[in-house]
Amino acid sequence: GNVAMHLAALRALEANGGTKVNLKYLIEGSEERGGEGLSQLIKDRPELFAADAILIADAGNSAVGQPTLTTSLRGGAQIGVQVDTLAAGVHSGQFGGAAPDAAKALMRAIDSLSDEYGRTVIDGVDTTAEWSGQEYSAEAFRADAQLLEGTKIMGEDDPAGATPVANMVWSRPAITVTGFTSTPVAEAVNAVPATASAQLNLRVPAGADAAAIADAVCAHLRSHTPWGAHVKAEVLESNAGFATDPEKPAAALLGECLSEAYNAETAAQGMGGSIPLTTELQEAHPNAEIALYGVEEPKCTIHSANESVDPTEIENIAAAEALFLQRYS
């Protein structure tokens, strides 16, 4: 979608007299497959990426038809944890009830990373920050995240008041269990599990120290694993978040062009994903302005088997990009 958008913008630009901007386009896809070729190229040949303004089309509007600049990206980390309780699995009929179950121990440790309303808590880490940008309504989140009927948004049941969604997805740490292994269901036997392991995905708000918070998660897991179970928790990798100022000249101009293309005021939002390229480019070129936008509004369901794009988003974002390239010079 974003590639088609760039092509449409270039065609519109050519049809309307071109631009005086010295223009570079980079299209790269290996990062989505875990490749590091672009990261290495930025380190080896930073001069190739020198620019006054860097526009990264790897984001999207908050909704179809609502022009949006992304001003904040979460950083994150991958954390591995393993719990061992027995030298080997033992018969649940003979030992169950007294023998410590490694799977249960790991479940309890992971569960301790949430309060009673499902909000993330980490020993020694502030998890109460407030988001000051555009709101993210509970209704929109339910639709975007495709919650099943009757399921609750985390923090929704707090008697003191529901926690705003934007706080939890853009301003506070979040932990997701992305993998869990003990005995596969297909191989279930009547035995007390001796070992269990999990992989956790940590997301942290822009400006937070992802590595330090990941270390705090590991310490929390060690502290909260019950029954004297042996626990190993380690940070597998981490990456920093990113924030940009929408009031700087290039971002402000892009916002104006988006507003003109959509005939609506441009909003600012955070984004839960991480784009390591942003921090790598900013480190290589500290004075460059970086703006994040694109065609990936929530209904695109990016990274899913049925991802899609709304053609009107391609049309309008392309028009905004063409306007920007005409005026930025």
PLM regions: where:
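A short beta-alpha structural unit
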Residues: 202-205, 232-247
